[in-house]
Structures are given as C-alpha cells and as structure tokens.
UniProtKB/Swiss-Prot annotation:
Leader peptide range in chain numbering: none
GO cellular component assignments: cytosol
Disulphide-bonded residues: none
Gene that specifies this protein: nsrR
Residue numbers binding [2Fe-2S] cluster: C91, C96, C102
Residues passing through the membrane, by range: none
Any Pfam family matching the protein: Rrf2
Biological-process GO terms, alphabetical: negative regulation of DNA-templated transcription
Functional note: Nitric oxide-sensitive repressor of genes involved in protecting the cell against nitrosative stress. May require iron for activity.
Protein name: HTH-type transcriptional repressor NsrR
Annotated cofactor note: Binds 1 [2Fe-2S] cluster per subunit.
DNA-binding region in chain numbering: 28-51
The UniProt record lists the keyword Cell membrane: no
Length: 141
C-alpha cells in the first residue's frame, strides 16, 4: 500500500507546522518551497486539513496557517483515515462475479485496520520530538 501524494504532503505539511514555534504562522508558499510541491496541490491539501480542524487558516496581511490543535493531539492514523481512500480493492457486484463468496476483501480490510492501529500509536508530536536532524533539514536555509 502506498499513500497518495495528497496524504503524503498533508502529513509533511503538518510535520512542518508542528516543528515551528507555536506562535509562528507559516504560509502555503513556505510549505511548498520546503517540499517542492505545486502551490495548487498544497492549497487543496491545506483546505482539507483546515476543514478537518487540523489547520487554522487566518486570512489577511498578518495571516497564514498553523496547527489547529496541539501536535500531541493529532494521531497519524486519524490524519490518514481523513485524507486517504482506504479501499485496497474495488469490489462491486457489477464488476466482479465472485464478490458474494470472496474472502480477500475481508483479509485486506483486516490488514488496513492493523495498519491504522499502528499509526494510531503515534502522534504528530512523536514525529518531531527530539528530532534534531528534522529540525536541521526543515528550519535551516
């Protein structure tokens, strides 16, 4: 399983915001510069994260973006659930004639649940706490 770029960059944006001092706002442009992703793509990601309450977006001259809640309260599993389409196979009566007897979907759903359970053990704070190499990469120019 590979996360979509939407989820990947959503997590990266959250990690960047979490690495900043709490009072510091950042901008979408700053995040796109750090990660080399298109501004249009990042705008969509930040809009979704804002809608979920994970990012506060403040408009105006002194505006910007920042985490919408403390990093210790943002579980990685919750972010992935919110951003990622988690169906590994496309099972429907119309496209597959073994759907009614297939056990593969059950096994794959169990695998997804184990994956998410592991991600739920980790918060955004865990990703940045005492991570000096991360700070050096993100916060030095």
């Amino acid at each position: 399983m590979q996360l979509t770029s939407f989820t990947d960059y959503g997590l990266r944006a959250l990690i960047y915001m979490a690495s900043l001092p709490q009072s510091r706002m950042t901008s979408i442009s700053e995040v796109t510069d750090i990660y080399g992703v298109s501004r249009n793509h990042m705008v969509k990601i930040i809009n979704q994260l804002s809608h979920l309450g994970l990012v506060d977006a403040v408009r105006g001259k002194n505006g910007g973006i920042r985490l919408g809640k403390p990093a210790k309260d943002i579980r990685i599993g919750d972010v992935v659930r919110a951003l990622e389409p988690l169906s590994l196979v496309n099972c429907s009566q119309e496209s597959c004639h073994i759907t009614s007897a297939c056990r593969l979907k059950v096994v794959l759903n169990q695998a997804i649940e184990r994956f998410l359970e592991e991600l739920d053990k980790h918060t955004l704070a865990d990703m940045i706490e005492d991570n000096i190499p991360l700070y050096k990469l993100l916060l030095t120019e």
